[in-house]
Structure formats: C-alpha cells, structure tokens
C-alpha cells in the first residue's frame, strides 16, 4: 500500500459567511497523469512527495479525490478589469483545503482547471496544458528570483481534450498560496453593501496574514498600511527584473503581497517602459512602466472598501485612507532605488542616485539594449559588450559609475559580489519558454520544460550551462504576444 501523502487539511475560508464562496463537488477527470511535480515544495509543505506521485496522490492533484479535512469550494470576488468593475469569482478553480505545515503555517491548495463553477460565466472551467505548464515554470522562476509569489506543486494532464480555437490537451495545476484573498474579495464584500461582511473579511485577513495587528490601535488602518507596504515591495521587485504582469486587475492583487495569475505575463527583453505583451491590453494600461501607478490605483480601491471600518465619521475615514495611499509612492521609489543600487554594486545612498540611474535607463532605451543582459554584462565587467558601447554618453556614465563605487568603503570585489546576487544571469526568456511549451504540447516531449525549470532554479549561478538561456532572441520582442489561456 502506498504510504499516506500526509495531507494535514483544514479549510478556514469555508467558515466565512456563505456569500464568499460556493461549495462544490469536484468534476472528476478521465485519466489523470502527472507531468510536473515540485518535490522541494511538497517537502516544505510537510507532504510525502513519493506518495503524491502514485495513482492515489495524482487523483488528489487532478481533483478526483478530496483529502480528509478538505472541502472543495469556489471563491467569490469582484474586480476592476482594465478599469471596469464587475462581479467575478473562481471560474475554473477550486480551493480544496489549507495544508497546515509541520511548523504551523497555513497554505491554500487550489486546483486550477478543475471544471465549471457558478462563476464560470459560460466557460467550461477547464485549462489547457500549455498555460498550466507556463504558470508552473514562471511562478517557480519568480520564487527562485526571491520574489513573493504563489507556487506550483504539480501539473496533471486529464486525458481529456478541451477546445480553445482548436483541440488541446486538458490539464490541472495545483497552486499553493499563503491565501487567495484579493483586493477583489474585499470589493465583492463592499459591493454587496454589507459592512459586517467587510469587517468579517478584514478580521480574517488580519488573523491569517497579520496577526500582530489585532492589538493595534486601529487594526483596519494597520491592515491597509501593511498591504500597501507589501505591494510596494512586490512591484519594485517586478520592475527590477523586468517582469510584466499583463493583467493587473484588482482581482489579481493579493492581500498577502504574493504575485498571482501568470496568464499573459512575460519578461522584458529590450528595455522599453511601454512594453506590453498581453493580447487584450490594446491601450497599454498594464505596460511595464505603468505597473507602479496601477498598483497604487488598485490599492486605492482596496482602501475604499475599508473606509467604513477606519472611523465612525466617513469624512475622517476617507482622510485616513487617502493618507495611507499617499505613502505608496515613497515606499515604492525607496524600494526600487535600494534594489537598483544593489544591481550596480552600490552599498550606500547619494543624493544624485535617481538621476544617475535614470540616465542609464534612458541610454538603454535609446540603444534598444537588453534589460537583463545589460546588468549581467556590467556584473561580468564587460560593458564593452552592451548595446551602448561606443556611445559618448555611456562612456561618461561608466566613468561616473566608477567614481561612485570608489567613494564607498567596500572593495570592488565586494561590489561585484553584491551585483552577482542581484542581477540574474537567466530569466524565463520568452522564446525559450515558447520553445519548451511547443515541444511539450505539440510533441508530448516535456524534456525542454524540465531543463528550463532546472536552469531557472539557479538564476544567480552565472554558470556555463546557462549561456544558452541568457541569449536574446534573434528577432526583437516587438510583436511577441501573450494570452491569458482562459
């Protein structure tokens, strides 16, 4: 008999008021087969990875069986999608429970592509293999980069075909998150006009993510401030690695501060603040350079839901919310500048740093330089290999950089070490991702996906094996389009 997988399930979300979710029975799939499995994550969750890879374990990962203590439900939420408010919910995902780890932490276990729910809005509730492999690959790459993110435990094919303009193999992704509470969850509660529901949800969020706030003078204001702080940190980290989320709707902003929803995301090759990849972002609302402002806007929508809880007087509540939101920009800029200094081997701050960095970025834009490789080449001491080489302004900037480093107490070797730990040698290059996914979906060969996952686990290794994955595409990124996969 296969050893138990060691699920240690609860579902605290199911104890919230009924409007926040819909209880469902799983939609079993015909012939589940394990394609990808994240053994280190399973171990961290206190699970028996070997048992999970056996047929009984795969049945859970496919949604055919719910472990004891679990309770399948689809979460309700709302959201501003490209600025337009609408009621939403999990249209193709089920929260089957919360795994309590050996050290007492709690993580959502969600099955994505698990079938229809009351929130499917006419969709089939299923997912195609390609987008599920893509989320596994990129979410785990983000984790390796040190960026807060939901994780991927497994991808299972269903043995069933789904229709997305053509027939495609169906799949289920097991997503792991600190929680799936979203700004949109609060908008859903507020949109129903039930202040008590908003309070219940806020109390739950505090208990789940910020228990230290329960005793603060105004716990709901503290909650708002903490979410702002986490998001300012998260967005700065996106910008530092050239990550373009692609669909920054309010339902895709988490209360935990994790990156969520990897549908149309991609990493920028050539540096350009106007970079957009998503097929549906025709106006560039969620372009790379707009992400901080959009995050600020989303957080303002979160603040609006909390106003009745901040103070008895509405005017006072609005003032408190506005004051908190105004703090986002300063926190974001501070985080981003601190991060960009590390990318340049700078240990201390100086007054002219922002102008100094912006000059480099302007030159990168003008010369169509690759974002990741520019910092990689500076780290390797090879500025002559960058796209700006030979430009007089770049020579001036290099001289300023050398002078800037010479004014700090740390040695050049220490500066280079700092750069190596903050400038990835490899990112999920769009052409490499597409190459791997095409092989997996069209040829049923998952070897390239597994190779890419292995390389991306060590983004700061600077190894010879990574050279192929650091190469820029032969054709520039203009015209590269991503799709949400729904």
Swiss-Prot record:
Binding site for Mg(2+): 252, 261
Molecular function in Gene Ontology: AMPylase activity; ATP binding; magnesium ion binding
Catalytic site: 251
Catalytic activity field: L-seryl-[protein] + ATP = 3-O-(5'-adenylyl)-L-seryl-[protein] + diphosphate; L-threonyl-[protein] + ATP = 3-O-(5'-adenylyl)-L-threonyl-[protein] + diphosphate; L-tyrosyl-[protein] + ATP = O-(5'-adenylyl)-L-tyrosyl-[protein] + diphosphate; L-histidyl-[protein] + UTP = N(tele)-(5'-uridylyl)-L-histidyl-[protein] + diphosphate
Domain of life: Bacteria
HAMAP family in the record: YdiU_SelO (MF_00692)
Protein name per Swiss-Prot or TrEMBL: Protein nucleotidyltransferase YdiU
Organism per entry: Shouchella clausii (strain KSM-K16) (Alkalihalobacillus clausii)
